[in-house]
Amino acid sequence: LTDTKPHDSDEIWDKLSAPTQLSWGTTDIRYPKLSIPDVKKSNRWQTKAWKGERVNAQAVLWTKVGLEDASITVSDLKSGSSIIPSSAITTNFVRYVMTDELNKDRKGGCGHRENKAEWDSSVVADVLDIVKIRDIKARTTQPIWMNIWVPQSAKAGKYKGTLTVTGKNASPMELQIEVDVLNRTLPAPKDWAFHLDLWQNPYSVARYYQVPLWSKEHFDAMRPIMKMLANAGQRAITTSIMHKPWAGQTEDHFDSMITRIKKIDGTWAYDYAVFDKWVEFMMNEIGIDDMISCYTMIPWALSFDYYDEATNRVQFLNTKPGDAAYADYWGTFLKDFSRHLREKGWFEKTAI
């Protein structure tokens, strides 16, 4: 990606005293890709944490020469005979993506942009990459994100360890880690009082991993992603009960998880197979079971899908609240949906 924003020239990069440098930075800054980071060099990161708490840090590497097969390792953190294992620590290269302005008018809103040329684009550090070994180009900056999940069973004390970056053509570079674990315990995420609801899009997972919707491969791909969400304290399951509830403005639009069938005699039937499969997966395998959020009876576009047996095709009903057709479409569905939810034991935790 080429950044259109001003950045350091080759001459500035070439003045670096050491070809490759590594330091702790701050989690408050997205470091530009093509400029030398503005950091006060430090090889020691110190923080305090409760038992059961997760703490984050960001290191930043910058280099005027290309690095081959760069990778990150962390040691166990030790306090006397007590250990926070390296398995409780995750590290990721931070990947850069192209984005555009959101807050040009300082109103902080989103929406349609009639003239997209008026909104500037830039390269920003955003994605915590799943790639563990990568080449780093000359005259670039590479942030590194570290997360430590202190075990609830950890003993209080000061734990020390190291983060190391290595590469084929570079000597190992080390940073020191020091976590002061206090004698207080944070409850497990499932026991938090805070209500977190980050919408899930299973359709995007299927597209990204190129697997059939609702197949075993699809659920296998979603499992680690949704478990991360559960570990963040997620409370609600996102379900789409109609086609494109948000008019399809996301990269991967939401289909309806419930099939509506208008029979030849004009009566309605409903297939909840996908809805049930998704909800049961999230509840039973992931552990998110406080609430089922259903979207929506009032979509951006007042157009409602159903399969029509008379024409053997999917049709769309254009209607609005107050119309008889709207009352028939939704009233009949809500009665049957309520029956189904009660049979599953989900009625009291479902909201539209």
Q: Where are the regions a protein language model picked out?
A:
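A common structural microfeature
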Residues: 54-58, 67-69, 236, 291, ...
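Aromatic-lined carbohydrate-binding surfaces of glycoside hydrolases
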Residues: 120, 149, 160-167, 173-352
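Long, low-complexity ectodomains and other extracytoplasmic segments of secretory-pathway proteins
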Residues: 1-44, 65, 170-213
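Extended hydrophobic/Leu-rich segments
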Residues: 1, 83-84, 312, 316-317
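Short, solvent-exposed loop/linker segments at the N-terminal edge
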Residues: 47-53
